[in-house]
């Protein structure tokens, strides 16, 4: 059989035309140093700040330092499996995390991977971990209350949906308990909660998750955990991951509460990374942009305008102080970023006042706009009363001769302190808070022994649930007080059934 040259040439031409090369072009570099959660790579000349890079073993990193000769990378995974001389390539992408309703009830790490042993997660949706905060015209004033269920907060330092309220205090003063109670109180309030645990012991996080699960709060809660044993890059990225998950719900018209527990540990992790990346240290060895670290995170919390769906994201960041020093660097930074702070005091905590909220140092810059009408009426003078009581209490240590008015103020103050105490994980519905505060401010507790105030409160709630539920319903439905004469009559009817 004769071979025809023209047939062979046409076949070769056809194959050349249909040839598709089986390779991809990627800019690669070589790892020159790796250790303590960071790596340096030579050869990634066109890498961008914040760009994801991929090491030869599949682990991802994020470009942070763009120097003339090399790129400083934070490693988002096990840096021990990376070796000097390994190749690293650009991906052309920024870091994204999976978001969506499928995350509710799950415990995930800052990369969005489940760590609760309940199976794989694939939400099908992602959002950038770092996102631009809503602009001025995209926001709306905070006007809806976010009830925490804690009398001391809802009466003295009210929080609104879309607010940023700092919780600050020494270690072991009940900061996490305040946040867990606030999450528990969102049951049935059409609220999604995200608890971001940064740099905590895994056993502690496990305890918090078990508490939330046992009390039915995991049905509307996502837990993001970067434990103390994990590399610094994961602790640094964790709050932004939590914010990205919250934004998905906020931009879909829903309401979200995000707890960052705590940002002091994130700042320490960022300081560690910055020093390892040879960035110049500033005050307390923190880098110069440590303010921006927290401001760009907390500015993402907002109450969106009606045009954008009216959703909200409320932030409760934590800062741990040393010996009550709220004038420290990170503490003052975050105080200046947030819309108020709740200061938890050591002395109050150990004297049995729990939650240990210092009414003098705590403030909400949203204030009455985040309270229902009924609460405004009963809690209006509470802060002043408490402040003058503390002043009088200090003054009376030097003398015992007191006139009747001063004695009455002291008696009312002691009962106020008792009323604001609350057992752990027992948040209180707002109508019951209004009821007990009404009884306090209208003198119904003046003849109740101080030690019996909490017992009086419990019995009064039971009595109202059984006999005067309609009065409580008026507060729930109208957000205002019922007729004062009816309320006084009902409280007197209760007192007649007791020895008070």
Curated annotation (Swiss-Prot):
HAMAP family: ATP_synth_alpha_bact. Keywords: ATP synthesis, ATP-binding, Cell membrane, CF(1), Hydrogen ion transport, Ion transport, Membrane, Nucleotide-binding, Translocase, Transport. This is ATP synthase subunit alpha. PANTHER family: ATP SYNTHASE SUBUNIT ALPHA, MITOCHONDRIAL. The lineage of its organism: Bacteria, Bacillati, Bacillota, Bacilli, Lactobacillales. GO terms for molecular function: ADP binding; ATP binding; proton-transporting ATP synthase activity, rotational mechanism. The record marks 362 as: Required for activity. Its EC number is 7.1.2.2. It is an enzyme of class 7 (translocase). GO terms for cellular component: plasma membrane; proton-transporting ATP synthase complex. Its main location: membrane. It is found in: Cell membrane. F-type ATPases have 2 components, CF(1) - the catalytic core - and CF(0) - the membrane proton channel. CF(1) has five subunits: alpha(3), beta(3), gamma(1), delta(1), epsilon(1). CF(0) has three main subunits: a(1), b(2) and c(9-12). The alpha and beta chains form an alternating ring which encloses part of the gamma chain. CF(1) is attached to CF(0) by a central stalk formed by the gamma and epsilon chains, while a peripheral stalk is formed by the delta and b chains. It holds the Pfam family ATP-synt_ab_N. It catalyses: ATP + H2O + 4 H(+)(in) = ADP + phosphate + 5 H(+)(out). Produces ATP from ADP in the presence of a proton gradient across the membrane. The alpha chain is a regulatory subunit. It is a peripheral membrane protein. The gene is atpA. Belongs to the ATPase alpha/beta chains family. It comes from the Bacteria. ATP binds at residues 169-176.
């Amino acid at each position: 059989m004769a071979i025809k040259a023209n047939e062979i040439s046409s076949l070769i031409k056809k194959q050349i035309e249909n040839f598709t090369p089986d390779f991809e072009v990627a800019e690669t570099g070589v790892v020159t140093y790796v250790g303590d959660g960071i790596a340096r790579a030579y050869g990634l000349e066109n890498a961008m700040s914040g760009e994801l890079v991929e090491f030869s073993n599949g682990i991802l990193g994020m470009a942070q330092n763009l120097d003339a000769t090399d790129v400083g990378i934070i490693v988002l995974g096990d840096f021990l499996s990376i070796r000097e001389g390994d190749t690293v390539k650009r991906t052309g992408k920024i870091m994204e995390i999976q978001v969506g309703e499928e995350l509710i009830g799950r415990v995930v790490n800052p990369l969005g991977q489940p760590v609760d042993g309940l199976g794989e997660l694939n939400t099908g949706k992602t959002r950038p971990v770092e996102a631009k905060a809503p602009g001025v015209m995209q926001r709306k004033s905070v006007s809806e209350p976010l009830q925490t269920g804690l009398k001391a907060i809802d009466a003295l330092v009210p929080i609104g949906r879309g607010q940023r309220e700092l919780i600050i205090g020494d270690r072991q003063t009940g900061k996490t308990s305040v946040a867990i109670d606030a999450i528990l109180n969102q049951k049935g309030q059409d609220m999604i909660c995200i608890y971001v645990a940064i740099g905590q012991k895994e056993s502690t996080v496990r305890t918090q998750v078990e508490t939330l699960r046992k009390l039915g709060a995991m049905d509307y809660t996502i837990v993001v955990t970067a434990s103390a044993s994990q590399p610094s890059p994961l602790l640094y990225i964790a709050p932004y991951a939590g914010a990205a998950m919250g934004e998905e719900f906020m931009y879909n018209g829903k309401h979200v509460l995000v707890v960052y527990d705590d940002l002091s540990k994130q700042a320490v992790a960022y300081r560690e990374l910055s020093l390892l990346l040879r960035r110049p240290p500033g005050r307390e060895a923190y880098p110069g942009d440590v303010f921006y670290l927290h401001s760009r995170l907390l500015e993402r919390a907002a109450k969106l305008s009606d045009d954008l769906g009216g959703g909200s994201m409320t932030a409760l960041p934590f800062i741990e102080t040393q010996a009550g020093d709220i004038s420290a660097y990170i503490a003052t930074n975050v105080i200046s970023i947030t819309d108020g702070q709740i200061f938890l005091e050591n002395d109050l905590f150990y004297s049995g006042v729990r939650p240990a909220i210092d009414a003098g140092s705590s403030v909400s810059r949203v204030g009455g706009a985040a309270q229902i009408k009924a609460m405004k009426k009963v809690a209006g003078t509470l802060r002043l009363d408490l402040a003058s009581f503390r002043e009088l209490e200090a003054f009376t240590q030097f003398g015992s001769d007191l006139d009747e008015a001063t004695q009455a103020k002291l008696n009312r103050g002691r009962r106020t302190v008792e009323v604001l105490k609350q057992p752990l994980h027992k948040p209180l519905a707002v109508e019951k808070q209004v009821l007990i505060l009404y009884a306090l401010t209208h003198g119904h507790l003046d003849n109740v022994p101080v030690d019996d105030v909490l017992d009086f409160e419990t019995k009064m709630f039971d009595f109202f649930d059984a006999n005067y539920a309609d009065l409580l319903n008026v507060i729930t439905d109208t957000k205002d007080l019922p007729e004062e004469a009816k309320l006084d009559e009902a409280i007197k009817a209760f007192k007649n059934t007791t020895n008070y």
